[in-house]
UniProtKB/Swiss-Prot annotation:
This is Ribonuclease 3. Its main location: cytoplasm. GO terms for biological process: mRNA processing; regulation of gene expression; rRNA processing; tRNA processing. The active site is at 64, 136. Mg(2+) binds at residues 60, 133, 136. One of its GO terms (cellular component) is cytoplasm. The lineage of its organism: Bacteria, Bacillati, Bacillota, Bacilli, Bacillales.
Amino acid sequence: MSKQKDKERIHEKRRAKFQELQNKIGITFRNEKLLIQAFTHSSYVNEHRRRLHEDNERLEFLGDAVLELTVSQYLFQKFPHMSEGQLTKLRAAIVCEPSLVKFANALSFGELVLLGKGEELTGGRTRPALLADVFEAFIGALYLDQGMDAVIRFLEKTMFPKIDEGAFSHVMDFKSQLQELVQRDGSGTLEYAILEEKGPAHNKEFVARVALNGQELGIGVGRSKKEAEQHAAQMALETLRAADQQ
């Protein structure tokens, strides 16, 4: 087989993979070159003697800013009682490298990255920093191709549900949020109590209750007393938010 036919076969195989990705996420790029560029590492550009700006670094720069804005807007609307400091801490946990790597892996982004041979041989395809950069570059490409609304719809399918499911609850201090809200409104006194402790010593489960002036606001379950109280406070915040909206 000639080198030209080899190149054509590789090109078609690559395009098929990018088409699979678009089918998977329910998005069809108007400019497929942007999509491919989002997955093009600088090592591939250097090796194939392409123009420097054809790698994904500029798209990564843009995607980083778009991601920060969309996540900030979502958190601002989702957690109306959360302080600026808490919002900043939560956003940082969501857009940090380990988090973005998980989202990239969930979509098998690593399989699509175009790498130079040296980068491939040294495990670049699974390198966390590279995968996080690709995720940001993809966001940048999607923004350029279809605008902010398309980015938000994509994140509503991939990232925002994880926030709702509590994937980042370890950095969310619900007890402090609840305390600040109660103090601000002058509503009274919060009291926490452990209602139940069950399970063997190596696998304990606790049930906590939080009450305001003796009236129950939330029940939470956790592997520790602290975790159970945090979950109870989270439920209490949701209860108060629902009451505010009525």
